[in-house]
Amino acid sequence: MMTYMGNNQVSSEELKRRIINRWDEASKYYDYDRFTDEDINSKVRDTWKEFFNKELGSERLKILDVGTGTGFLSILLAEMGHEVVGIDLSEMMISLCSKKAQEKDLQLDLRIGDAESIPFENECFDVVVSRWVLWTVLHPEKAITDWKRVLKPGGRAYAFDTPSVEREANTIDKYFRPNLAKLVISIYERRNAWSEYYDKVIRSRLPLNYDKKGSFDRQMKLFVDCGFMDVAATKMDEASALSAEIWGRMPWRYQLGWTCNYEWYCIRGSKAVEPQEKDNHHFGEN
């Protein structure tokens, strides 16, 4: 006899297993820079490095990259001279990041790890960064709280994201076009494009999933609710412009199915400094 399990009856452990499987599969096709030339890819890296130079200053810092994926942030921060630790649930993503780092002769500390339960002691990082991560976390408030735990007093957390474009509530835009695109991609690239996307059960259990209105605003609120100070969101104009250019170069089969938001934003927050430490704290100064 078949037993039906509702969305809320699927355990977090089972959901996390499905999420890991999804990212292991997606790792094979995750990097869109395969569709662009080195000129624009180099501009993207330089733009993000310029942002971090302004934010972090010239001091060598110990940085945790949560959800490192194929290593976009980890690699460029290591190239800037920082000590970088990257964690990800997906072993395949970690493997790809490690391969890229070796090709560039960079030393990264890469580990399989959960954004909600950082495998490090309290107050051991100067900075925590994440890029396109919070939307895919089952318990984002738990994750952000743990990021704050591993930060040193006065340290900063950065969450980079592109706020979702609200889809019109019609069948064509919400269902038909994405599924048509996945069909075309599957045929053209000889793979199962559906395997890279979350099923309905997972999507319903992700509080900050892009399908849910106001998910970006809730990210900011969670930073405040979890105790971060000086929380602010900043639009990254140059990174956004380059993102728009890259999307314009994407194959038509990808543009067919999705409305892309090119606008990169950074949510930042600081961990409070203990009163006795304030006079000697100079984080991010050149």
Q: What residue spans do the PLM features occupy?
A:
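A short SAM/SAH-binding and catalytic strip from SAM-dependent methyltransferases
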Residues: 127-140
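Class I SAM-dependent methyltransferase SAM/SAH-binding core
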Residues: 64-66, 70-117
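Core SAM-dependent methyltransferase catalytic element
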Residues: 226, 248-286
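A short glycine-rich, Lys/Arg-flanked "PGG" loop and its adjoining helix->strand segment in the class I
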Residues: 141-153
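Short alpha-helix
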Residues: 209-227
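Conserved class I S-adenosyl-L-methionine
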Residues: 2-58, 72-76, 96, 156-190, 234-237, ...
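A short acidic, Gly/Pro-enriched loop at the edge of an enzyme's catalytic core
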Residues: 116-127
